[in-house]
Amino acid sequence: MAKDFLNGKRTHFGNKRSHALNSSRRAWKPNLQKVRILVDGKPKKVWISARTLKSGKVTRV
């Protein structure tokens, strides 16, 4: 399972709840993108969430 390289975001699991409060399992997945960034001065392909990219915490190479 992919995980955000910087802040460790990953899939969260829980229940879907219908109007009658029946439950079934579901997953919330972060919007992960494979991006080349500089890690220790070298370019590396890592998984980064779109939210992290938009915030400017990471710059692409």
From Swiss-Prot:
Tell me where the transmembrane regions lie. none
- Ranges of compositional bias, category Basic residues: 9-19
Pfam families under this entry? Ribosomal_L28 (PF00830)
Start and end residues of each stretch annotated as Disordered: 1-26
**Biological processes annotated in GO:** translation
Identify one Gene Ontology CC term for this UniProt entry: ribosome
Endpoints of the signal sequence = none
Q: Which cysteines are joined by disulfide bonds?
A: none
Gene Ontology molecular function? structural constituent of ribosome
Q: Enumerate the UniProt keywords alphabetically.
A: Ribonucleoprotein, Ribosomal protein
The similarity comment for this entry is:
Belongs to the bacterial ribosomal protein bL28 family.
Which PANTHER family does this one have?
50S RIBOSOMAL PROTEIN L28, LARGE RIBOSOMAL SUBUNIT PROTEIN BL28A
**Would you tell me the protein name for this molecule?**
Large ribosomal subunit protein bL28
- Its source organism is Levilactobacillus brevis (strain ATCC 367 / BCRC 12310 / CIP 105137 / JCM 1170 / LMG 11437 / NCIMB 947 / NCTC 947)
Q: Which gene encodes it?
A: rpmB
